[in-house]
Design a protein with these regions (language model features):
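A solvent-exposed, acidic/Ser-Thr-rich amphipathic alpha-helical stretch
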Residues: 3, 24, 30-81
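Short, low-complexity N-terminal intrinsically disordered segments enriched in polar/charged residues
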Residues: 1-27, 31, 120-121
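Hydrophobic pocket/interface hotspot
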Residues: 13, 25, 33, 53, ...
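A beta-strand edge to alpha-helix "cap/lid" segment located at domain peripheries
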Residues: 2, 58, 65-121
Length: 121
């Protein structure tokens, strides 16, 4: 993917989250996604914070949207690389987050990680 395509994918990801449309969010992820986030530790007691597969991600993201009906991401910066991107954004609770995303040949996330500075939802 070109830098422009990666930046467009990152902006579309932010827009999907801000729409609160779970299916639009999940459309950015491959079925075999491996996603690591501190919120999986808090919500599901997973010491490694790893969620595997779209079904686990669906459950996790649905719970996140329930817990935070005012969720909003304000994009601060996009970083791109050969096979993915990272986004730095500010949440509605003022915490800053970096999400890193590794993409497959179809432009869907196969590996991701969320890193928080401040409050986690």
């Amino acid at each position: 993917m070109t830098t422009e395509e990666l930046e467009a994918a990152a902006r579309a990801w932010i827009a999907a989250w801000n729409s609160h449309d779970l299916e639009a969010i999940l459309a950015h992820y491959a079925d075999g996604i491996v996603f690591q986030t501190p919120t999986a530790v808090a919500r599901w007691g997973r010491a490694d914070g790893v969620l595997r597969g779209k079904d686990e991600l669906r459950r996790h993201f649905a719970r996140g949207l329930e817990l935070c009906p005012t969720l909003h991401f304000e994009l601060e910066q996009i970083f791109t690389g050969p096979d993915g991107y990272a986004v730095l954004y500010r949440r509605e609770n003022e915490s800053r987050v970096i999400d890193t995303v590794e993409l497959d040949g179809n432009g869907q996330a196969v590996r991701g990680r969320a890193l928080y500075a401040g409050k986690q939802a």
